[in-house]
Structure formats: structure tokens, C-alpha cells
């Protein structure tokens, strides 16, 4: 009696069912990991934008304003007596919340963060992707910018 080697239809359906269950479990985890990576990248990018604006203000001896919208779009402008001159703009790729009014701050000639048009230093923070990963970019009173 010869025996044929192979899989039965029942074995094949069982393997497909197990594979479907494993995929259903893994896909949400992959999406969560992607959102964490996106928030990390956006926080690093915002910290770089803020540090660059601070260095620009110190190098030129004039205020530089950074505005960040809730959808992650940002703009950097030199503040002149005649108004603002755009320097850079871009997208962070994640939603942003801030305790700065309208998500805007200025770095003065000394590199300290202030509210737009203000003179007193003001610390604050930007929360990136609060609904998912919640990375925070902190601007300290002395001007130090760091990610947490």
C-alpha cells in the first residue's frame, strides 16, 4: 500500500485560520510602533528647528519667531521693525499642542525664549502626538531645548 504525502484541505484551512488570527493580533501593534517612531522623529525635528532659530537670533542679534500650528506645520520668521520676514517653514508630520499662546515663541538676541513681542523670558513646552506617543519638547527659561 502506497501512501501519498501532502496536506489535506482541513489542515490547510486550519493553517490559514491560525495565520489570520496572528495577523489580526500583530497589525495594531505595528501601527502603534509606527506612531511612536513618527512622534520621535517629529519631536527631534522640532527641537532642531527651535535650536536653529535660537542660534539665528544670537548670530544676527535680532528676534526670531517660531510658530507651530496644531497640525504640525511650522514657520520661522525674522522679526524686523517693518514686520516679519519668513526664513523657513515645514511640517513635523504629527499633531502638536503647546502651552505657548498660538504655539508661538520668539528667541531674542540673547537666545532666551519669550512670548512674541515680549521681553521677559518664558519657559514652555510642545507636546508631539499626545494621542499616541506623547513626546515633549521643552524650552527651558535659559533657552535650553530638549526632548523628553
Residue ranges of model-derived segments:
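N-terminal helix-rich module
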Residues: 1-2, 7, 16, 21-148
